[in-house]
Amino acid sequence: MMAVILIIAITATISMPLLQEQIAARKIDSIARRLITHAHFARQQALHLGQPVRLAPRLDGQWDGGWSVSSGCMGKQTQGDCIGKIWFSQGKTDPIFFKGGAKHFIDPHTGKTGILFNAAGAAKTAQGGFVANRLILGHQRVPSLERQLILGSGGRWRICNPARDAKRCH
């Protein structure tokens, strides 16, 4: 009986770090898929409403603090009585963080962080250029773990694991 308990204890001790890494990977994938889902929703709302919809960080341009999908009161001809609408809001993503200070998806002309989908559903800058960029997700407890969210110029999102497919991540 003691031998069985010893074997179970050794097995649990050996497998625990692998289990923790797998849980961390699933958390990163979950946040990545949630962000992509909200981006798809923002694009569809822009198409449906026929007006710009923005996916942007909630706090000071930092994606770690969460993000929101909003519409209304955007563009050059906003009216004073305009009321914006928040469609979705995501809270903090702890223990998942955005590497590189999350200084991605910044419009070079306006300095605003976020993705603006125009009425045609295209992610474009204020000057009409296409947005193509990436966000890199990490986990606080497993620093070696990373996922890259890549938005191509055609509007297609993909999740890339640089540990497995380094060629696709560039």
Where are these regions (language model features)?
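N-terminal helix-rich module
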Residues: 2, 10, 14-36, 44, ...
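Internal catalytic or translocation cores that form aromatic/hydrophobic pockets or channels
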Residues: 41
